[in-house]
Amino acid sequence: MIKVRFAPSPTGYIHIGNTRIALFNWLYAQANNGTFILRYDDTDLERSKQEYIDGIMTDLEWLDIKPDEIHHQSKRFSRYDKVAETLKERGLLYPCYETVEELGRHRKIQLSRKLPPVYDRRALKLTKEDKRLLESQGRKPHWRFLLPNFESNPFQIKRTEISWDDIVKGKQTIDLASISDPVLIREDGSYLYTLPSVIDDIDMAITHIIRGEDHITNTGAQITIFEALNAKLPAFGHINLLTTVSGQGLSKRNSDLSICSLREEGFESMAVRCLSVLTGTSKNIEAHRDQKALLEHFSLQNTSKSAAKFDITDLISLNSHFVHELTYEEVKTRLEKLSICGEKAEYFWNTIRDNIDKVNDAALWWEIIHSDQSFDAVSFEDRAFLQQSVDLLPEGSLNDESWKIWTTALKEKTDRKGKALFMSLRLALTGRQHGPEMGKLLPLLGREKIINRLTI
């Protein structure tokens, strides 16, 4: 059975880029009757917070992603410690004592000599006495994994290719001689992402690892750890990264692109899902009504090789398609949270929904209709015309036909037509050049408010 995982770090709220990875894994599992695991990468106990764990779960529920299993790496430290000890005993995990500053200086020297900035394994030359002396000075080791890029002498590094058939990008190759031995354990004893991830993927029988292409080099190193632990390799797939329009990478600092903020702004879940999945693929970005329809247009092989750019204007446009199809019953609860309620609420929604991009935008039109303010938005020359319009406003209760009757009478009386006739009335009554049909707005505004706004 196919088994995939989504492994966010609960050190912040997930953004649209994380969402794309989650959806690719979720849809791949759905397409293949597989299992989807949510695994919190919470080994950083200081920065990981329960509020972010709760937030990630809320976001996934909103995206209609339902994990089959949920795991926390913070509950598996004893397992990681056991594997780490085994690797240390085999000489595959070795202690290093350089400070960040020392490593930085060494890197600059290598670059100045036009050498690749790869760690030279000098720590392997330390004797027991050297290590005792360094530790007596207060230094604590970080631990590196010894990459198998040599025959017998670890200081005689040779070209060593690690290749895999990437299920998204095709054959990928990494030369282990071009990368440093990865640090797996920090000076304080905490684990970096690499080792716990491999151990969990083995223990949880993950069959397919689908993640961003920024992990390609990391995959080459991780494959050697899988092999060192005599584990079966999963299939790897690396999808193009989602960036901003300017090409900047997304991060948890892009709070305006977090799923939490997009949800609170009133975007529809399916709009976010459609754009996340279809951006950067050969498929057209379209509004698919539900996840089943989206799944029919999902394929890892459709992913392009270039970066996918996320444009908020695309999301707004896509979102409007969903909003225009929403019935009053579907949005009633959300409208009530915006204080939009009462006997005219349904008529109001049906009137304005085709002219808004997000459900939250309804609050603006509710305010326009119910506010006591007047809109001083017409020219001085139009004020006489507005006074004439008051005199010709149809008697009795206003309905859908009142606008046509009113403007016909005004046209005959003033010889105005087209924009000169309609725009002055729209500006005076709504303060805006564009919006819902005026014939639908008149019954919502009511006679008294109309007269007040026309009498400047």
Swiss-Prot record:
Motif 'HIGH' region: where in chain: 8-18
Catalytic activity: tRNA(Glu) + L-glutamate + ATP = L-glutamyl-tRNA(Glu) + AMP + diphosphate
Annotated motif 'KMSKS' region, positions: 249-253
UniProtKB keywords: Aminoacyl-tRNA synthetase, ATP-binding, Cytoplasm, Ligase, Nucleotide-binding, Protein biosynthesis
GO cellular component, one term: cytoplasm
Binding of ATP, residues: 252
GO terms, molecular function: ATP binding; glutamate-tRNA ligase activity; tRNA binding
General function of this protein: Catalyzes the attachment of glutamate to tRNA(Glu) in a two-step reaction: glutamate is first activated by ATP to form Glu-AMP and then transferred to the acceptor end of tRNA(Glu).
Assembly mode: Monomer.
Name this polypeptide is given: Glutamate--tRNA ligase 2
Gene from which this protein is expressed: gltX2
